[in-house]
């Protein structure tokens, strides 16, 4: 794997960008690294089912049964599983890992609700109808790491035919979404579901987006309300409305490249952003100036000119277990 995000113990706070500059060649070691980074590394860290039971599943029934409890467990998905159904509820202390690129859930998604300490890695989730929920939904939960997933639908239908790809709502906290391929969708990723939910969401919704490849997206790449976001080392290709900061959200946007976007970074209803070393590809940054200049963990930046070569072909479901 050819991206980087330096991992630091969860107790660090207020660090400047002291980590060494990343190189494309240095990114390969992360493929086998099981430690969460970004906001998911804080608040005690995110270890998923490490140290628990191990199960391999290849059917909808077996998958649903395997992931539901709160006991420590690692659930490997072998091959595709297709089922038109509501989201499968995922228990705490769970790692869901696709064994290779054939591990794709089609027609149903995952719901992490009122849970903690969950890892979802190397998994495909696609074409989940709106009536069945998001591809990956995180609600009222903390310490969730979504890494190397491939989430998509299509844009052949209207914008309400599918729901979100990765939505973080209802005061969820300490979430990292990394190294993922997020593509072919109308409304991709939402942090904070409603302008009217500030009382619940304020002080929560801390989310890191790192090393992601966004492609053929209409909007919400991502959209953030009330919370705190850090978006870095990501490549945005043909994303109409990119990063939307709104309703008091504070977002730090660094080392990203945009190609074919009309609105790369913008505010709605007093959302704020600080941006550094971003190539907006001719699109405008119209976001209000924010105050988030540091985050309480260490990380390394590729530089906007190197993001495409490091992320495209590496982000997504590219690992093997």
Swiss-Prot record:
GO terms for cellular component: extracellular region. GO terms for biological process: cell wall organization; pectin catabolic process. It comes from Aspergillus fumigatus (strain CBS 144.89 / FGSC A1163 / CEA10) (Neosartorya fumigata). It catalyses: Eliminative cleavage of (1->4)-alpha-D-galacturonan to give oligosaccharides with 4-deoxy-alpha-D-galact-4-enuronosyl groups at their non-reducing ends. InterPro entries: Pec_lyase (IPR002022), Pectin_lyas_fold (IPR012334), Pectin_lyase_fold/virulence (IPR011050), PEL (IPR045032). Residues 1-18 form the signal peptide. Its EC number is 4.2.2.2. GO terms for molecular function: metal ion binding; pectate lyase activity. Pectinolytic enzyme consist of four classes of enzymes: pectin lyase, polygalacturonase, pectin methylesterase and rhamnogalacturonase. Among pectinolytic enzymes, pectin lyase is the most important in depolymerization of pectin, since it cleaves internal glycosidic bonds of highly methylated pectins. Favors pectate, the anion, over pectin, the methyl ester. Binds 1 Ca(2+) ion per subunit. This is Probable pectate lyase A. Keywords: Calcium, Carbohydrate metabolism, Cell wall biogenesis/degradation, Glycoprotein, Lyase, Metal-binding, Polysaccharide degradation, Secreted, Signal.
């Amino acid at each position: 794997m050819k991206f980087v995000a330096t991992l630091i113990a969860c107790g660090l706070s207020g660090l400047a960008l002291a980590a060494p500059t990343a190189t494309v060649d240095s990114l390969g070691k992360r493929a086998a690294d099981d430690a969460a980074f970004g906001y998911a590394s804080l608040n005690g860290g995110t270890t998923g089912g490490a140290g628990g039971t191990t199960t391999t599943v290849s059917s909808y029934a077996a998958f649903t049964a395997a992931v539901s409890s709160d006991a420590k467990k690692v659930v490997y998905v072998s091959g595709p599983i297709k089922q038109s159904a509501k989201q499968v509820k995922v228990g705490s202390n769970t790692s869901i890992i696709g064994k290779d690129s054939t591990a794709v859930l089609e027609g149903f998604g995952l719901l992490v609700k009122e849970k903690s300490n969950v890892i979802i890695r190397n998994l495909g989730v696609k074409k989940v109808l709106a009536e069945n929920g998001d591809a990956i939904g995180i609600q009222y939960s903390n310490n969730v790491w979504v890494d190397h997933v491939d989430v998509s639908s299509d844009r052949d239908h209207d914008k309400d035919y599918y729901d979100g790809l990765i939505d973080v709502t209802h005061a969820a906290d300490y979430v990292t979404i990394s190294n993922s391929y997020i593509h072919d969708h109308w409304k991709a990723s939402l942090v904070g579901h409603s302008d009217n939910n500030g009382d619940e969401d304020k002080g929560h919704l801390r989310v890191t987006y790192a090393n992601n490849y966004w492609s053929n997206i209409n909007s919400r790449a991502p959209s953030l309300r009330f919370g705190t976001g850090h978006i870095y080392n990501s490549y945005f290709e043909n994303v109409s409305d990119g990063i939307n900061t709104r309703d008091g959200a504070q977002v730090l946007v660094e080392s990203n490249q945009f190609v074919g976007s009309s609105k790369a970074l913008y505010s709605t209803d007093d959302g704020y952003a600080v941006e550094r070393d971003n190539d907006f590809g001719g699109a405008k940054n119209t976001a209000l100036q924010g105050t988030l200049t540091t985050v309480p963990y260490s990380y390394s930046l590729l530089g906007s000119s190197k993001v495409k070569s490091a992320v495209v072909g590496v982000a997504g479901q590219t690992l093997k277990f």
